[in-house]
Amino acid sequence: MTQYSTIAELQNFIVLDSYTRSSMVSEPPAGYQTEAALEREFIEDLISQGYEYVPSHVTPDALLCNARNQLQALNNIVFTDSEWGRFLEEYLDKKSDSLAEKTKKIHDNYIYDFVFDDGHIQNIYLVDKTNIARNKVQVINQFGAQKNRYDVTILVNGLPMVQVELKKRGVAIREAFNQVHRYSKESFNSESSLYKYLQVFVISNGTDTRYFANTVKRDKNSFDFTMNWAKSDNTLIKDLKDFTATFFQKNTLLQVLFTYSVFDASNTLLIMRPYQIAATERILWKIKSSYQAKKWSNPEGGGYIWHTTGSGKTLTSFKAAQLATQLDFIDKVFFVVDRKDLDYQTMKEYQRFSPDSVNGSESTAGLKRNTEKNNDKIIVTTIQKLNNLMKSESDLPVYQKQVVFIFDECHRSQFGEAQKNLKKRFKRYYQFGFTGTPIFPENALGAETTASVFGRELHSYVITDAIRDEKVLKFKVDYNDVRPRFKNLETEKDEIKLNAAENQKLLLHPDRIKGISQYILQNFRIKTHRTQGNNKGFNAMFAVNSVEAAKLYYQELNNLQKESDRPLKIATIFSFAPNEEQSAKGDIKDENFDPSAMDSSAKEFLAKAIGDYNVMFKTNFGVDSKEFQNYYRDLAKRVKNQEVDLLIVVGMFLTGFDAPALNTLFVDKNLRYHGLMQAFSRTNRIYDATKTFGNIVTFRDLEQSTIDAITLFGDKNTRNVVLEKSYKEYLEGFKDIAT
């Protein structure tokens, strides 16, 4: 009989491409279904999906007895009473365990070497992560004392892992959230409580259902971090019946708990969002199906993920890379960033997700050593180092191996050359791109687009999705012609005209620099919400067009606040930007990490600015390459911690830098497309209730450029979703400019 090998395994995704909603015919109107009836219906739906209902396990002793039975069945053993007592005391229900230690047992330490009474040692598993279907899923309800009686608990192998709090239809879902918040303070975390094993909370009022991680760092504001489940096209699944049929499908729930979650180095449990899971699943499916069809080393064997800036691409790419390293036919996984500063940031993030899962390299030689190591660690590197390695080494063992490349926002000048070398050197590779702003024919400068390099789009989650889901904020853009005599230049779009010497001179005219600097100082505290005396408010960034502009603004701003009793702490950073061709319209010029290539006047000014910084923060940085890198890192940390009030930049920090407490971007620079979206997105991270949008204050007329960019990276209706109305539009009676 002929043997056929499968070309591509079934997609078996947990984030579904299509889902038919439950019939709503039998659903009673809001107000008619009691909370108890909603709970009963929910449990019946779970039973019909294969959950075992255990009606009488509502006391701690009954819960422990059930856990014993389930763990014995999972491990094919029988504990004597004394062995079970020791197992509880030493490991399962250790009195000194915190919530974090219990979570660590589920994620990392789920196998325990137990010494039985007869002296033999055996591995006892809490969960089976290899064969996920072996884990027993049960449901109990109304556990606990009268005061804190929990609605519905999902047990996995006898351990409470998901807690569901229900409110009847029509009641605000926040009430369920507040109840969980109260329980976790009062009783979930009491000594010797198996409820410390809880990983996920689900809250529902029947019509809106959300999930979120159980983490020590939760407060009442973290309602903002609750999530709806969704289909792969990002359509939300909110109704409890639909949520139950999808999220609570047994395999889906177990995958969310054990595969699509990360317990990071700071003891925070991160449960992935549906779009992050969807992207990861589709990358893994593509690797497997391309391997089986032998479609490696071409765009057909890969694809790209379009996830908007601020939607958590780093976690998604990490999980995709981590799961790819676990595929038995994959030898190496590379995560490639396009700038040295992102190399460092990604290493820090990846190490936070899993300290031992990554190899970084300071040099091309270090990268070469990492390719030779026989382990399954993810190699994080820059495109420059990878390109140098391919140019200098014509024959390396890794070139013949099965390799996955995941590129983050790589569409710089070096990208074209690196792609040619990749095709030449690596014989069996699969490559995937992550981008918040793809290159389409409309914003491409050459022939290459994101799709022509990486293959088709595998998943998208665009800015309108993120704003709807309240994962990022809208932008409020104000254009200010502070000095009317310069207005013509500020509205000029032609780069050639703008770069003409006389126009450059006018844009840097002392009157213009002074006028803009005064405007910034006068409006800074209002824009950054620092008008209340004790309010820490936010901080800001100022994007300027050149090193010369940075110098003039830095001097003028400091000069103007000499007499101030509360001067702003101002810092600046820039470096040499080689004169390279852009690969997409609106790319922000890439600055390298070597200030030594700058002219002497720029270097002198940078040394002076770093000197001021050293005095301000009692540090000791300089302009040589290594010290400059350390300055960059220290500055990044202080901007995130709001120790720096205003950071003046030319290109650095405008892409890939996350500082949720930054809410304002001042702009004296012509931004377009990719560069505009990247720069604006520094301001729109969710932070707290005071931060309602990202403030963009421009001293060039970027209105049309803004509309062009958000239309390209969203859709024709995007403008009304992405932009808050400007002051001018409110004055004109809420008129919307047609997109």
Report the location of each language-model feature.
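Long, hydrophobic alpha-helical segments
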Residues: 687-739
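A short beta-strand element within the Helicase C-terminal
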Residues: 649, 653-678, 694-698
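Inter-Walker segment of RecA-like/P-loop motor cores
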Residues: 351-391
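Conserved interdomain linker/interface between the two RecA-like ATPase lobes of SF2 helicase motors
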Residues: 455-541
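Conserved C-terminal RecA-like helicase domain
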Residues: 505-646
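ATP-dependent helicase/translocase motor core
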Residues: 2-332, 341, 345-356, 384, ...
